[in-house]
Amino acid sequence: NIAPKGIEFGLGGFYTYADNDYKMKSPFQEGLTITRDHDKFKKTVIGGSFKARKWWFDLVEFEPVFIHTYKDIQGIESNIRHAHSHSNAFIFANKMEKENFLLDGLDLDWQLGYIYTDYHFADTASHRTHWDGTHYPAVSEFGGEIGKWASLLTNEKHQLQHKLNLNYLVNENHSVNFNSLLKYAHANPRDGMKDKVIGYRTDFPSNMFSWVAGLNYDYRTSNDKFLNSFNVKYYYYSMKTRMASVLVKTAEDIDTHKNDFGISNALRYRITPSLMAKASFGYDVRLPSEEELLGDGYVIAPAGNLTPERNISVNIGMLFDLTGKASSNLQIELNGYYMHLKDMIRFTGGFLQSQYQNFGEMRTLGMEAEVKADMTRWLYGYVNATYQDLRDVRKYEQNTTVANPTKGSRMPNIPLSLIHI
């Protein structure tokens, strides 16, 4: 540290190594004891930090980070012996903060991040191995232990993310906030071995850009009895790539540009100093993430034609709060909520590759109760009970005019009720 100049330096890192071999009885062959190995894992992380607190900005921070990861692929049903992956990530982050930026009452928070990753997956073994050690043919004439083809994948990604938050305090009753989140991602997957097996190229470069901008206005009374927060958002995203299936040779050009608006309002009213009522409603949009759109180049196929999720929601609740007013710091909260989600994005498995897809419409009705308290000076108690009824409300099967046979049915693999203690 250089304290008089407000400058701090930092350097750190860690190394992780795991290689846990163990024996177990085979669930596939009676009387056979197998050794589970090929699960080596290595990770190296090195990072640095530079902070300046006495420049024109209140805080200027730079952080470079390097991450290297190696992982053996361990089979569950099959005895994978050679397939493995490794990756390198180079990360650079910059953050700047300034109170009273350009004018009194205006606070700035700026964040910029760049990530470069190169991911490699190798599955070119000349044969597969049974649990008893005997060999049998690879998945293709070019080798491979997993899936339906050999693979020698390289996937390079460039990601750029920028966050900006400007908060302006007009006076004790009014404040305005502007926030912006911009993301850009470029992926370039290449797998010549897979192309050899299939006979044509299925992985192509992709470019994704998204921007979410929001403007928020808060009004609160001088006695803090009433607070209202009104928010509007603008959403934009574009995706340019080519998509080809491992089953269809022809590649489809994808050049998507979509935009939308969102609006929400939340309010709360203090009935007593410890009891408040709250409510909110909104129309929100969730843009597809970089992982959902670009996939990983191997197990997860790109989904450049995804549509943003759109959600209408209503929430009503009560909060009884004794935090700082009693030794128990008791909090009791009750909420009821309704959501209608369109174009829900979900992960769907496939015979050869999995992919994220738009599902359709889903309606949610729910209630939630939560109690938190300090039971003693050293014991904290927490219990949460949730009831959630999620229903498929699609009229038709996805992208067809065929009536949906599961309309009105509960969504699978989502619990109707749950309790956390």
Regions found by a protein language model. Give the residues of each.
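Extracellular loop and loop/strand-boundary signature of outer-membrane beta-barrel proteins
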Residues: 31-36, 74-84, 97, 146-152, ...
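Membrane-embedded beta-barrel scaffold of Gram-negative outer-membrane proteins
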Residues: 18-20, 270, 278-282, 308-365, ...
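Residues that define the transmembrane beta-barrel architecture of outer-membrane proteins
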Residues: 1, 40-46, 86-92, 156-160, ...
